[in-house]
């Protein structure tokens, strides 16, 4: 790497252009080999930066979602779980239900892939930059009960529930029903 290339990479890092910094040398070499115009070269650099930022945003959304593991629809065994028809799940994968603010409930016995499907749809939502949050019902209730004891129930509800475009609450069937409805 020439000293000038090194300075360009350092400047990119200083200006927080990590995508350009990571791709600069390879793109400069490609531009020289293909005799790209300066404008074409700059466009390639800017597209690399944009994609880098989008990837970081998707990673951040997935991290904030709090998934116990990353699951995808490609990993789901539709042959094993016959109660979830592929066509219906692929319809859900359009995430139109999120835009319509509709609820989706997966019902079935333990071990058929309800959590896998919920996480896979949630992960897909994070990749489309929807604010998404995953909770087990028990964790959500414990958090809300603690907030109520501290007099911060409304704030906790907003932070845990209302702030997200997609909220996934897993293992609801494992909680006892509490008279009064609120923790």
Name the predicted role of every residue range.
Residues 114:
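Conserved lysine of the Walker
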């Amino acid at each position: 790497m020439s000293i000038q290339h090194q300075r360009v990479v350092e400047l990119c890092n200083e200006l927080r252009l990590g995508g350009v910094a990571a791709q600069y040398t390879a793109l400069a070499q490609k531009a020289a080999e293909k005799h790209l115009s300066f404008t074409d070269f700059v466009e390639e650099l800017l597209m690399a930066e944009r994609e880098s930022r989008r990837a970081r945003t998707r990673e951040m959304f997935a991290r904030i979602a709090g998934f116990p593991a990353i699951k995808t629809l490609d990993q789901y065994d539709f042959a094993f779980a016959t109660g979830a028809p592929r066509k219906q799940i692929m319809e859900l994968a359009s995430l139109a239900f999120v835009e319509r603010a509709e609820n989706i409930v997966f019902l079935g016995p333990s071990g058929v892939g309800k959590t896998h499907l919920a996480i896979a749809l949630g992960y897909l939502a994070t990749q489309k930059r929807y604010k998404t949050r995953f909770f087990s019902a028990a964790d959500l209730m414990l958090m809300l009960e603690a907030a109520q004891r501290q007099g911060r129930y409304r704030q906790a509800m907003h932070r845990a529930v209302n702030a997200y475009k997609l909220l996934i609450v897993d293992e609801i069937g494992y909680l006892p029903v509490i008279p009064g409805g609120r923790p």
